[in-house]
Amino acid sequence: MKIRFFSDAYKSKRASHRLRGDVTCQALLEQGYDAKILTDWSEVDADTIVIFLKRSSVASIQRARDQGAKTIYDLCDNKFEEKGEYEPCCQLADLVSVNSVNMGISTKNFTGKNSIVMPDPYERPKLSPRFAPGVDINLLWFGSQSSFKFLPILEVWSRLEKEIGNYCYTMISAKTDRVLGKFKLRQAKGAVSGINFDRLDMREWSWELQGQLLEQTDIVLMPVLTENPRTDTKSANRLIDSLISGRFVITTPLHSYLEFAPYTWQGDYIEGIQWARNNPEQVLDMVTQGQKYVEDNYSARVLSKRFIEEVIDQLRK
């Protein structure tokens, strides 16, 4: 049996392709499966399972089916009302996989189809837990450009300046210069106030830079706006990558985050920063336990094995 991963616009820089394609594929390969990213369509036949990742088309799924393959359509964004291909891709594929329980519920509501939940695995190397802030506490946020939509950015910047004072907030994503430029212009015009740009460090994301900053930071600070219906279907990938990196996470209690509540602060972020400063030993203990939990339950090896076994079981029915 061959397992192939495909997207019509495959890009390893895209987190969903990297985690649900590259990382998962490599884990299956290391366990003895014939798994790879699909580049040669002549390989696709009746002995093939093709997993279609983000930005796949109905035409590609049909092509695989025409060549005799079993097909899985993988969803990790709750955009059924925006992306016209989602529903027909789900209907055409033999199976649907999703990145969270709530994404599965949304998929069922929109398509009537059940799905296999395959959480995102961690991809970062394990680092020693550390929490030893100096006079200025180092805070880190990382995410895709679209993740800015779900961050109460102006509120966070203003509250950090008013209520914390001694901090450096580093934020890495795509096109951060545009975000920074927009808010500098708005503050210059008097449309907003209270932002201390000297305490903000906004940089262009790269996988390597994220790793360097995780080593240096004290806290991963990533509050989330919960009013948007897309937020509660998200996976916990940023949280688990932070924990495996040995860093304390302060965030918002999304559904996929709740199982990590014993190891993170999920609530008011200013209170969380203040509590962490006052309880460094407890922070270290939480991070250490959280890191072990992630290592035991969210490795690509564990998740990919469980996933492919469920896929094979479902396809036999």
Label every PLM stretch briefly.
Residues 1-56:
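N-terminal pre-catalytic "stem/leader" segment of glycosyltransferase-like enzymes
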Residues 7, 11-27, 124-127, 132-216:
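Conserved catalytic-core segment of nucleotide-activated headgroup transferases in glycan assembly
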Residues 35-107:
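Extended catalytic core of nucleotide-activated donor transferases of GT-like folds
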Residues 42-43, 56-57, 102-104, 123, ...:
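Alpha-helix capping/helix-boundary segments
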Residues 94-128:
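Donor nucleotide-sugar binding/catalytic pocket of nucleotide-sugar-dependent glycosyltransferases
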Residues 125, 278-313:
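A charged, aromatic-enriched C-terminal amphipathic alpha-helix characteristic of glycosyltransferases
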Residues 148, 201-212, 220-241, 251-261:
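Nucleotide-sugar-dependent
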